């Protein structure tokens, strides 16, 4: 995802730069924001293999932060750095669904692996148990739905991605 200028031309671009066309994030976070047409995004990326490789790169890249239009480090930047998961920023909503996109490209085991990593490494039962601010229940709903093995990649729809639950039972 890349911003455009008012005249329709492409804006200068640095995928690690925060701000500008990206609210509290960068291009690595917003690249996956085609909730309504994941298959179209996969096709645009070059197919399943290239799509999966691009998701893999989010975790493999260094946690580089360029302040961009913010001019200083904001808490979302710090949270991403502290997580030590490359450019993956669980502490901010725009990328939280990305892990589930592995399943759309035929690799649900990677979805399972990274969900477990995020749940085990970034959440705990202390007063600081979320990897960022709660933002209208975003952190807790991601955790609960992921623990139950369901997730709505496209908000506002009744379509859910189903995976193996991480919990053996739940009362709803």
Regions found by a protein language model. Give the residues of each.
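Catalytic cores of carbohydrate-active enzymes
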Residues: 1-93, 134
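Well-ordered alpha-helical scaffold segments within catalytic/enzyme domains
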Residues: 34-46, 97-106, 145-150
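Structural helix-adjacent loops and short alpha-helical linkers that scaffold large soluble proteins
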Residues: 42-53, 103-115, 155
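A glycine- and small/hydrophobic-rich beta-loop-beta segment
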Residues: 69-72, 97, 108-121
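Catalytic cores of secreted or luminal carbohydrate-active enzymes
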Residues: 107-118, 135-160
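Acidic, glycine-enriched catalytic cores built around paired aspartates
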Residues: 127-131
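Conserved small/polar residues in nucleotide/adenosyl-binding loops
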Residues: 161-168
């Amino acid at each position: 995802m890349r911003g455009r200028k008012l005249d329709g031309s492409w804006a200068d671009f640095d995928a690690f730069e925060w701000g500008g066309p990206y609210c509290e994030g960068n291009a690595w976070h917003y690249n996956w924001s085609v909730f309504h047409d994941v298959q179209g995004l996969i096709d645009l990326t070059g197919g399943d293999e290239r799509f999966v490789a691009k998701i893999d790169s989010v975790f493999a890249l260094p946690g580089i932060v360029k302040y961009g239009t913010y001019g200083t480090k904001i808490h979302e930047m710090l949270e991403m750095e502290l997580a030590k998961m490359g450019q993956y920023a669980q502490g901010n909503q725009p990328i939280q669904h990305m892990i589930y996109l592995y399943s759309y490209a035929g690799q649900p085991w990677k979805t399972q692996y990274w969900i477990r990593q995020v749940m085990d490494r970034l959440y705990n039962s202390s007063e600081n148990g979320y990897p960022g601010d709660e933002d209208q229940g975003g952190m807790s709903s991601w955790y609960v739905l992921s623990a139950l093995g369901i997730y709505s990649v496209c908000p506002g729809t009744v379509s859910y991605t189903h995976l193996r639950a991480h919990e053996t039972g739940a009362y709803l």
